[in-house]
Amino acid sequence: MHGLLLAGLLALPLNVFAHPTESHSSGVSRRAIDITSYRLPQISKYTKSDAVPKQDGESFTTSSTGDDNVSSGDYVTTATNWLKKTLPKATYRLVNDHYIGDSGIGHVHFRQTAHGIDIDNTDFNVNIGRDGKVFSFGNSFYDGEIPKANPMVKRDFSDPVNALHGAIQTLNLPVTAKPENVKAKPVEGKENFKFEGTSGALSDPKAQLVYLQKDGGLVLSWKVETDVGDNWLLTYVDANKNDQVHSVVDYVSAAEYQVYPWGINDPTEGNRTTIHLPWLKTLSTDWHIDGKGWYPTTRGNNAIAQENPTGHPEYENNYRPKSPLFIFKYPYSPAMTPPSSYRDASITQLFYTTNVYHDVLYILGFNEKAGNFQINNWNKGGVGGDFAILNSQDGSGVNNANFATPPDGQPGRMRMYTWNASTPERDGCFEAGIVIHEYTHGVSNRLTGGPENSRCLAALESGGMGEGWSDFFATAIRLKAGDTRATDYTMGEWASNRPNGIRKYRYSTSLTTNPHMYVDADGLTSVHAIGTIWASMLYELLWNLIDKHGKGDVTKIRPVLKNGVPTDGRHLAMKIVLDGMALQPCLPNFVQARDAILDADKNLTQGSNKCEIWKAFAKRGLGVGAAFNQTKRTGSNELPAGC
């Protein structure tokens, strides 16, 4: 689950931040079942660009515009040949989410198979450079002995309905599946089913027969998918012993407008103003068109925003403000109460912030082919049908927020709650950093491992980086014109009514204010605590690049690019972090993500910022000699030669 504050990192008496008793959540009770104990193992390897073996033979050129032309099939062939050369005995399938990013890198993803069955946590991603050769690659393929017996021959596995019952009982899921009512209906794919006749889930549960790489071997499992609101789970149930769960992945992480404008983080930083036609010209349409209609409400191609006071999964018929003239101006002040009295302003603010962020990310490369959130992809690649569902004042919780990220083609879902640590209570929709944090979970999950694979941040350190990326983008976007590297920032300060925010330390380049180092992750089990370390490193990176390239005009929304490269350090940092997500392997660790960011800069600027990047990471212990180990990390302040 990708919530803003589900963390033991706070060391606060405010345990309401982690599914409070006041919440009417339908998700997994974290006091009863700790689903984090079922995380996927962290087994990926990443071969960075300067470690890729020398390549001979023909090459092709990717298009920096991302156009799919004759060469588009060639980069897939090059990637496939590289996999065959690297792992000649492996069997696999091509995942249908390859694309050429706007930085000119071709991204191709493969899934390992055995007896025609997916080994679900095995991935091989190949990044093809502008010169047509392999730029870098990641690998988590299983290299052990494949079971000799084909389970499909003797049908040596349980009925999928039994696996569904196993998932429900083991995880105490709020799903009812009476044996006499439940039917497993086959759908497209081998041993792939949808369950009919259940209740309690937001959509029909599903199951697929897969292998899972675990403890040095392969276990045949049913991958059971259940969306129960606060948790959208993939539960890997043993295909023979249905009371045994091997692993769990959670997809959830949580005109004219009168709003707090872009760059104003919360009501303490500025006043509401009227914004005219705020959308950026990234597409040929505005925010209220999806190719099927023009909606005089908070609905369009990128998002649909509404109130949800009951916390119910239904959203299409929920209340949202309407304006035939597209004038969304409604009263609000932080002193107003109850929250329902300003619901129109809340929904409008949420719709505005999310759409602006969508447009900024689009310019920086998170577009249709990369798996962004849009109903209509305008024939530009990727899978459509997946705008972001935005719930304002969601009644399923308080003092939090979350975002669920299923694979490309299925809508993301953001739940924004009210916060009761102040009088009157506060609405998280008016703190842009919370909205941006949650939406960024959708971004990092879609980019890492490819748009069709939403389980690539399910390991502990990977999930921690997911939280860190979300804090980083929220912080980078709120920078002010007078800020310097001596400026510190908090997260969630306004909504939580806590002057120091909701993280252990402020984000700061001062090691006195924020002493976090890489090795601090040892012993941590909270993704939010680990994420604070990662975001602290990225904050150093941000200021190193700003000091070199300037921060640009922070009052302007649209990033300025020259030959595809942002001209200011702030957006350049955001760009190479985004590109790094697409380069890194599935289930990355800090070291691999650092290398992917270095590779992103190498591709984008020919490595002109190499030393600035290394200095940022080395300052906080992720230098040349740093090494990942789940329980005992090796820190390093060493810089490479020349830096």
From Swiss-Prot:
Secreted metalloproteinase probably acting as a virulence factor. It comes from the Eukaryota. The keyword Phosphoprotein does not apply. This is Probable extracellular metalloproteinase 4. Its EC number is 3.4.24.-. One of its GO terms (biological process) is proteolysis. Residues 1-18 form the signal peptide. It comes from Trichophyton verrucosum (strain HKI 0517).
